[in-house]
A protein has these predicted regions:
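Pocket-lining segment of extracytoplasmic ligand-binding domains
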Residues: 91, 166, 172-262
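Solvent-exposed, polar/charged alpha-helical surfaces in well-ordered, non-transmembrane soluble domains
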Residues: 53, 76, 80, 94, ...
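Short, solvent-exposed loop/beta-turn-alpha elements that line the ligand-binding surface or hinge
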Residues: 57, 209-214, 280-289
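Secondary-structure end/capping motifs
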Residues: 229-307
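Short, glycine-/small- and polar/acidic-enriched structural segments
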Residues: 26-161, 165-168, 184-190, 201-206, ...
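Short polybasic/polar patches that bind polyanions
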Residues: 56, 154, 197, 262, ...
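Conserved C-terminal helix/tail region of periplasmic/extracytoplasmic solute-binding proteins
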Residues: 298-333
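Short, low-complexity disordered leader/linker segments with a strong preference
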Residues: 1-34, 329-333
């Protein structure tokens, strides 16, 4: 059974379980509408949206579906019609969804940055130009953290391919590899990169924002085009919930950090450190950063991240949907 097949079976099983256990929705504008939302155990507003019932209180029935195969798995489930919404990184999403170009659109961002390059505390690496012939652990060869790492090297005049890459697949896996000495460099993401500094096994070399010289586009929601077409008001309510939950992170950091840490199954200190040291931050605007995304994926194209016969900058302009976020923000009190 291949990866896509395993992912779809897992999503179907999760939906079956949730359809049995989902509580009845309240009366409201969303009554009779079910939203299947895929999520990952990462730093996000999802746990706040869930605990505060921001969608359910409007009448929606929400199936919160855990995704274990990363954004590629979520993309497969969205394309197959098993998920309506998925949380993910805006840059990775362009690369991955370009293989199913009409399946979905990125509709609203919460964060910037989040992708960070760390080196071992035992390493003599001082800057990106020193990363040549090194062992580098990544979560995947086509992920956003790997892309921002390679952009940083390219900017420093270094050939990113002049290193040996190891794929860990998970954040905790990267922590373990660095701790064991299996790699000298980590192209990682929060909160696990923060954990490396707190454990004094690694130090931050540069962030995604450092790599591109501006706020690095981060994470947000991706919606299937079918769901957008059939339930545009539900899309707006989803964004209202996302933006309210993200506002909560800014206004109630102590409670939010605890909630996000429990959700991601990490220490609260790592989440707090990630925000306080600007390894991740709340975006200045929740509207997708089209210019930043297009500029970043243009470099991704040069670095070989694009699937065959795909022009990532052209696709990104189609994939980023700013209209819903702009409308929701314009009508906020």
């Amino acid at each position: 059974m291949n990866l896509v097949r395993r992912t779809l079976v897992a999503v179907a099983a999760s939906l079956a379980l949730f359809s049995i256990g989902t509580a009845g929705a309240a009366d409201g504008p969303g009554k009779g509408i079910t939203i299947n939302i895929g999520y990952f155990p990462v730093v996000s507003p999802v746990p706040i949206m869930r605990t505060q019932h921001l969608l359910e209180d409007k009448g929606y029935t929400v199936n919160w579906v855990p995704i274990t195969q990363g954004l590629p798995g979520a993309a497969s489930a969205v394309a197959a019609g098993q998920l309506d919404i998925a949380w993910g990184n805006s840059i990775s999403a362009v690369v991955i969804f370009s293989q199913s170009p009409d399946a979905a659109q990125f509709i609203g961002q919460s964060f910037i940055n989040a992708n960070v390059t760390v080196v071992s505390t035992k390493s003599d690496i001082k800057s990106a130009k020193d990363i040549v012939g090194k062992k580098v652990v990544v979560s995947g060869m086509k992920t956003a953290s790997t892309l921002f790492f390679q952009i940083g090297l390219k900017k420093a005049g270094v050939d990113p391919t002049a290193n040996e890459y190891f794929v860990s697949g998970t954040g905790p896996g990267m922590v373990g590899v660095l701790d064991s000495g299996g790699a000298e460099v980590v192209a990682g993401y929060v909160p696990y990169v923060a954990d490396m500094e707190l454990k004094k096994i690694g130090r931050v070399l540069f962030t995604g924002s450092d790599a591109i010289g501006r706020a690095a586009p981060g994470d947000g929601f991706i919606a299937s085009t079918k769901f957008i077409r059939e339930h545009p008001e539900a899309v707006k309510d989803l964004l209202r919930a996302q933006f309210a939950a993200t506002d909560y992170i800014k206004s109630n950091p102590n409670e939010a950090y605890k909630s996000m840490a429990e959700f991601a199954k990490v220490d609260e200190a790592a989440v707090r450190y990630s925000f306080e040291k600007n390894l991740i931050g709340v975006a200045s605007s929740y509207v997708p950063d089209v210019d930043g995304i297009v500029a970043t994926v243009a470099v991704a194209q040069e670095l070989g991240f694009a699937p065959k016969d795909v022009d990532l900058p052209t696709y990104a302009k189609k994939f980023e949907n700013t209209s819903f976020a702009r409308e929701v923000l314009a009508k906020r009190p």
